[in-house]
């Protein structure tokens, strides 16, 4: 689990460019072991600081307009292993250990289970690697 001091977390959070109208950055969660992209969400400054200081991933819910801990109710917690931000400082990559076999609220390992193929869309079977 990766954690930093509150002082360092605030310094990092200040470097980010919260350019969207709701003052968030794009957050991509990638599974530590497999490298699989699990989900994309949003983080505001508070979510970044809480994630970095606790080692447990927090997001900003655009629909509910509130901070949420991934897995607080479902048990599908994400533990932070690495934290990166991009060259524009408006997106972050969270390398996480998914505490369960599910990251998606639809019950799949990844939110990216709709595969567009010639002839239509295929829903991939759940993969619990």
UniProtKB/Swiss-Prot annotation:
Organism superkingdom: Archaea
Co-factor(s): Mg(2+); Zn(2+)
Co-factor remark: Binds 1 Mg(2+) ion per subunit. Binds 1 zinc ion per subunit.
Residues that, per the record, bind Zn(2+): 87, 104, 111
A biological process from GO: L-histidine biosynthetic process
EC number: 3.5.4.19
Compartments in which it is found: Cytoplasm
GO cellular component terms, semicolon-separated: cytoplasm
Primary location class: cytoplasm
GO molecular function: magnesium ion binding; phosphoribosyl-AMP cyclohydrolase activity; zinc ion binding
Alphabetical list of Pfam families matching this protein: PRA-CH
Keyword annotations: Amino-acid biosynthesis, Cytoplasm, Histidine biosynthesis, Hydrolase, Magnesium, Metal-binding, Zinc
Pathway field: Amino-acid biosynthesis; L-histidine biosynthesis; L-histidine from 5-phospho-alpha-D-ribose 1-diphosphate: step 3/9
InterPro entries: PRA-CH (IPR026660), PRib_AMP_CycHydrolase_dom (IPR002496), PRib_AMP_CycHydrolase_sf (IPR038019)
Catalytic reaction list: 1-(5-phospho-beta-D-ribosyl)-5'-AMP + H2O = 1-(5-phospho-beta-D-ribosyl)-5-[(5-phospho-beta-D-ribosylamino)methylideneamino]imidazole-4-carboxamide
Description of how the protein assembles with itself and partners: Homodimer.
Family according to the record: Belongs to the PRA-CH family.
Function summary: Catalyzes the hydrolysis of the adenine ring of phosphoribosyl-AMP.
HAMAP family: HisI
Name this protein carries in UniProt: Phosphoribosyl-AMP cyclohydrolase
Name of the coding gene: hisI
């Amino acid at each position: 689990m990766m954690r930093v001091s509150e002082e360092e977390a605030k310094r990092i959070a200040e470097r980010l460019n919260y350019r969207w109208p709701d003052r968030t950055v794009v957050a991509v969660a990638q599974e530590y072991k497999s490298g699989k992209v699990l989900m994309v969400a949003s983080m505001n400054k508070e979510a970044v600081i809480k994630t970095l200081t606790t080692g447990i991933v927090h997001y900003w819910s655009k629909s509910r307009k509130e901070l949420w801990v991934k897995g607080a109710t479902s048990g599908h917690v994400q533990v932070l292993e690495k934290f990166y931000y991009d060259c524009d400082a408006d997106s972050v990559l969270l390398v996480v250990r998914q505490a369960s076999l599910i990251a998606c609220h639809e019950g799949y390992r990844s939110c990216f289970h709709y595969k567009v193929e010639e002839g239509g869309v295929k829903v991939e079977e759940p993969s619990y690697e």
